Amino acid sequence: MIYLHAIDPIAFSLGPVQVHWYGLMYLAAFFSAWALGRSRILRGRLPGVDMDGFSDLLFYGMLGVVLGGRIGYMLFYAFETFLANPLILFKVWEGGMSFHGGLLGVLIACWLWARKHRLHFFDVMDFVAPLVPLGLGFGRLGNFVGGELWGKFTQAGWGVIFPHAPELADRLPAQIQAQYAAGALNQFARHPSQLYEAALEGVVMFVVLWTFSMKPRARYAVSGLFALLYGVFRFIVEFVRVPDAPIGYLAFNWLTMGQILSLPLVAVGLVLLAMSRRAPVLQPVLPVPAGVEAAK
């Protein structure tokens, strides 16, 4: 049954402060990363690092996601808008985050953290990779709740009508409700591409990466699998997702910026998986409790 999107993007209000679902999804993403990371730390999957060290790593990662995601969006998708008004960079509440920018931010943050703790960069990335997909899934759910980044038109029975899409933007909510009830808006149903990405980049990637990383793997393998899966899934979903308005299609009347940015991930993923065939395997080492270490 075709669904009319009517979710209030504001979860609740605390006096004059409005708490948006999108912000709550970010909190859920960081909490899931903390919970999963804690489990891996306690099982010794990043030797030499305890919970204090992991908390430090998570802080670095959070900064990388937020700063990289916002800057990346401005550079990749809204550069002209940014040049016209550079202060828009700080208006994060207006939306606009890029996964590829966030990934670059996380890579830089993890490199700095790994250097600080004298660890191999890819040992850190292999540890971090399984913590990311659930956060990606929560982010895509936030996109769906906010009624943004919708897909192309579809006749599928699970299509979604987005009231803020261009074809309905000039209609009043009451008009939209009445026309939807009469079945007059079915031709405006779109692919819920946000939910496709939540399923593929969130659920499927998490199950595959978490299961794969349960056993000690060769260096580069987990990171390579992450890059390969994300690049492939994102490239596929872009075929049913409307390209960002300021850019549109870049070539062939179908190639999008998201696909161009995903192709290097596929290539990097394949290279890392090939490198892992001759790389050492990082064996788990359980962290030493602080009290025991002090007694020594």
Curated annotation (Swiss-Prot):
Which Pfam families does the entry mention?
Answer: LGT (PF01790)
Enzyme class, UniProt record, top EC level: transferase
Locations listed in the record:
Cell inner membrane
The name under which this protein is listed is: Phosphatidylglycerol--prolipoprotein diacylglyceryl transferase
**One function term, GO molecular function aspect:** phosphatidylglycerol-prolipoprotein diacylglyceryl transferase activity
Give the EC number(s) under which this enzyme is classified: 2.5.1.145
Q: Which HAMAP family does the entry link to?
A: Lgt
What topology does it adopt in the membrane? Answer: Multi-pass membrane protein
* PROSITE patterns, per the entry: LGT (PS01311)
Q: What's this chain's function?
A: Catalyzes the transfer of the diacylglyceryl group from phosphatidylglycerol to the sulfhydryl group of the N-terminal cysteine of a prolipoprotein, the first step in the formation of mature lipoproteins.
A cellular component term from Gene Ontology for this protein is: plasma membrane
Q: Where does this protein hold a 1,2-diacyl-sn-glycero-3-phospho-(1'-sn-glycerol)?
A: R140
List all membrane-crossing ranges: 10-30, 57-77, 92-112, 119-139, 194-214, 220-240, 254-274
Q: Which family does it belong to?
A: Belongs to the Lgt family.
UniProt pathway annotation? Protein modification; lipoprotein biosynthesis (diacylglyceryl transfer)
Domain of life of the organism in this record? Bacteria
Keywords on this record?
Answer: Cell inner membrane, Cell membrane, Membrane, Transferase, Transmembrane, Transmembrane helix
Classification via InterPro entries: Lgt (IPR001640)
| DNA-binding in keyword set | no
One BP term from GO = lipoprotein biosynthetic process
